[in-house]
């Protein structure tokens, strides 16, 4: 028995998973509450589970293209089988030749190996230009060379079996499953029926089914005609080749039914042809599957913004498109490393960015902390559906209720209007008629107004206008400065030298001293003059008194 494929997760990925799991165990994750945000033009459109993955699992599907018919019916179906066999060889021989050229390009000399590989790739590409993806695919094809050789050793036994699904493990380094969609048809139609069929009917049935399968093969390998062996096969193509038997390999590799539908939609399950043998009509495909780690309690929340009415015009909230929350921590999630499906995110790494306190407060329900940008124009869709209801900006469009008839008006200062079946059963918005089935309960906040201070300018045109105003102000300031410089140029520089300034200061001090002394002297003279006046007045009064006394005598 061969060894089973390793499903161990690499150390760097395991470290990432452990860190994320530790964070997720701090506190259960709560999704962002969209009820207080809806009336502010911020709509929570949905959540997705966050998973981390690496493409580390591989298995092989050996597609048995030529079925084995019962001995008593081989002669009846010989003609359609021979035609089918010739068509298969014509269709798939370029694929087989391309695979062999690339695998045989490996030499023991290190210097010429890369050159031979690139030459083999370019030899199989129509335009003569090998892309990075094609070089990567060729390298993977070379790595699978030994496994393909091991499968070819068993080709006779695989071709001889009548089983539609057969697990091949002898001498193989990874799980391999031989499947035959046509063999399944033969077994169901001829081997398990007691009804006798005439030879013509057998030939017709086999011919029709083989033609249908050839059509599927042409659809699958259409892109391979221009660059054989270098294009990945999608999961849909693998199912076309293997039919329902594909599930057997996926189950063996540990893909459960609960993950299968999501992984199929992600495009992470792919296949690469690694061999084609025209003698036995066997086609080997190496299937690559992801190892997926589920991050408990980590969800990605998607946010959409609606153009709202403000006193400064139409504006939209400045919030991230995708955020993730673990406990009380909310951060922006970078989905450029992720593949999205309807319910899941599959990421090679988790990258988050911290948010400003204002945005954090806004997403926590404090709508007065939300900031808005005047970037949305009047042609932006002014409404959004959510859970059977509508959030609309009835300032930008006419919200006409068909049943019951009426116009839904948006009060002055309100950012948006929340419309549900309670207020309108059938709503017409710009020629689009919607039947409402949802309801906004009392927990939804309404009548939210956006203050002027919450609206900022971030649009390119608006910023250009503001920059123009700033440039005008700067130009005016430069003109004033130039005028001031002209006035300063008229000043005699010699009068402003250091020695002249010292002289001016000394002279000023001397002048001040003389001025003070003069003031003191003037005050003294005035005081002395007043004293003399008093003395003369006193002498005059005494003389007058003496004269009066002499007259009386």
Curated annotation (Swiss-Prot):
It is a single-pass type I membrane protein; Single-pass membrane protein. A lipid is attached at residue 523 (S-palmitoyl cysteine). Glycans are attached at residues 85, 191, 366, 447, 471. It comes from the Viruses. The chain crosses the membrane at residues 501-521. This is Fusion glycoprotein F0. Disulfide bonds join 76-199, 338-347, 362-370, 394-399, 401-424. The record marks 116-117 as: Cleavage. Homotrimer of disulfide-linked F1-F2. Residues 142-170, 466-491 form a coiled coil. The inactive precursor F0 is glycosylated and proteolytically cleaved into F1 and F2 to be functionally active. The cleavage is mediated by cellular proteases during the transport and maturation of the polypeptide. Keywords: Coiled coil, Disulfide bond, Fusion of virus membrane with host cell membrane, Fusion of virus membrane with host membrane, Glycoprotein, Host cell membrane, Host membrane, Lipoprotein, Membrane, Palmitate, Signal, Transmembrane, Transmembrane helix, Viral envelope protein, Viral penetration into host cytoplasm, Virion, Virus entry into host cell. Class I viral fusion protein. Under the current model, the protein has at least 3 conformational states: pre-fusion native state, pre-hairpin intermediate state, and post-fusion hairpin state. During viral and plasma cell membrane fusion, the heptad repeat (HR) regions assume a trimer-of-hairpins structure, positioning the fusion peptide in close proximity to the C-terminal region of the ectodomain. The formation of this structure appears to drive apposition and subsequent fusion of viral and plasma cell membranes. SUPFAM superfamilies: Head and neck region of the ectodomain of NDV fusion glycoprotein (SSF69922), Virus ectodomain (SSF58069). Residues 117-141 are annotated as: Fusion peptide. It is found in: Virion membrane; Host cell membrane. The keyword Glycoprotein applies. It holds the Pfam family Fusion_gly. The keyword Transmembrane applies. It comes from Newcastle disease virus (strain B1-Hitchner/47) (NDV).
